[in-house]
Amino acid sequence: MKDAVRDLVREALERSFADGTLASGHVPDIVVEKPALEEHGDFACTAAMLMAKAEKKAPRAIAEIIITHLNDRESLVESVEIAGPGFINFRMRTSAWCRVLRRIEREGGDYGKSEAGAGKKVQVEFVSANPTGPLHIGHGRGAAIGDTICRLLAAIGWDVTREFYYNDAGQQIANLALSVQARCLGVEPGGPLWPTDGYQGEYIKDVARSYLNRETVDAGDQHVTAAGDPHDVEAIRRFAVAYLRREQDQDLRAFDVGFDVYFLESSLYAEGRVDDVVQRIIAKGHAYEQDGALWLRTTEFGDDKDRVMRKSDGSYTYFVPDVAYHLNKWERGFIRVVNEQGADHHSTITRVRAGLQALDAGIPKGWPEYVLHQMVTVMRGGEEVKISKRAGSYVTLRDLVDEVGRDATRFFFLMRKPDSQLVFDIDLAKQQTLENPVYYVQYAHARICSIFENAADKGVVPPTVDQASLESLGTPEELTLVKLLSSFPEIVEGSALNFEPHRITYYLQELAGAFHSFYNKNRVITEDADLTGARLLLLHSTATVIRNGLGLLGVSAPEKM
């Protein structure tokens, strides 16, 4: 509907230029927004105020000219008025709003989608957990956010590649191997022989047991059979990484999250990509030796101080392989890359971007883009839950999904902006009441399905979209529903382009609330066949949009609850 109003204003301006009542000939960016106050109409346009300087006229005078040149051929507009300094306020006819129901019925599961990103490629990297233990709730929030961003971008036409980067190299992996070896040898955590910084969760015992039993693990492109030798640390490392990759993959599949590409950090070293990046930076003159270490002049690219790339012991700091990895992304042709990560990665952003700029490879500043999510606090009975027996020191994603279910877990993870801290109330997530946000939305869908069952039991046949007498609609509750339904495509596009999945959860809760309000105040099946048919069509469209919205979140839309 906004587009229709925008087109009306644009055409009015073109007619004004043609007859000379406006002289500049410049059509501004026509902004149409929903007014803050309902009494100001359905839409407000600021074009007159934006044109005042170029036209050398008062905004209200320009607004009057625009209004007189409007040609509402399709009878969309009920009234137009000038407000304040020059806002043009539009109130739309009920018949215009009801057109959206025909569109929803025509497009069905595609309603909300667009081609805004058609022909464009984007790579989204998310989760990218170290294969050193079970996925924790922070990984879970990142998985929900990243997966939904992918769904949203795909919905508006982008060609999306989902990627998981396995940090299977470095000291953490060495600590993992030593921890599993200790368990293989019967060493208990806390004892004098337990490795420094060893992993203490119960899952380490599971890995050790499987290794000693010479089990075979398939994880992605890895097929590893355990050697069973407790003294072969390298064999233990290979098996442990594959074992935990498999565990993480299983948890993600259960969470309805999948990937197109799994990229191993170890491959960067095996192919010499890390060394190559360092040599290229040196050759470009952006590195120097000091105190036995190799430094990158990150201050040349906006950092507050230079950073060490290669330590005095010859090992690389953690951001150097990240630079090599992102160069690889660029070389694979991904002009747009989005990294969804925990907020603890914030410090690496400037360093990675500086390293990429130092390569002088044509990579634009500010590449890649980042979405950082804040921590999750899990509450039960008013107290924070911190420990998982299996993981030893944190709550796992599997713990949460097993207790409250996939739908509630995903929806709750997506109820706040990524950069806002999230309190996950287990008790609320398990409630089958309208106080539970995901239940509230799903129940609206199930309730609509039950209305159609009831109609069928009474022999009421819902009309087709062409048969329905939509002019019968007009109560405040009906109009609220229709207006919300019409805004769904805009909500989807805004959520996608701004990487803000929480907008969908907000919208669905508002839509469910509007439905419940309608249902409490209006009978659906009445003695008036035309009104019954129109209301059934309205509810069918509402169910379609709820289902489409939940699908974008990776949440089911049950027909019975």
From Swiss-Prot:
Main location group: cytoplasm
GO molecular function annotation? arginine-tRNA ligase activity; ATP binding
**What's its EC?**
6.1.1.19
Q: What residue intervals hold the motif 'HIGH' region?
A: 129-139
- What is the top EC class of this enzyme, as a single word? ligase
Q: Name one GO cellular component term.
A: cytoplasm
Alphabetized PROSITE patterns for the sequence: AA_TRNA_LIGASE_I
Reactions catalysed, semicolon-separated, are: tRNA(Arg) + L-arginine + ATP = L-arginyl-tRNA(Arg) + AMP + diphosphate
Q: Could you tell me where this protein is found in the cell?
A: Cytoplasm
Q: Name one GO biological process term.
A: arginyl-tRNA aminoacylation
Annotated InterPro entries: aa-tRNA-synth_I_CS, Arg-tRNA-ligase, Arg-tRNA-synth_N, Arg-tRNA-synth_N_sf, ArgRS_core, DALR_anticod-bd, Rossmann-like_a/b/a_fold, tRNAsynth_Ia_anticodon-bd
Check the UniProt entry and state the signal peptide residues, or none: none
What family, per the record?
A: Belongs to the class-I aminoacyl-tRNA synthetase family.
Q: What is this protein called?
A: Arginine--tRNA ligase
Species source reads Geobacter sulfurreducens (strain ATCC 51573 / DSM 12127 / PCA)
Ranked from the top, the taxonomy reads: Bacteria, Pseudomonadati, Thermodesulfobacteriota, Desulfuromonadia, Geobacterales
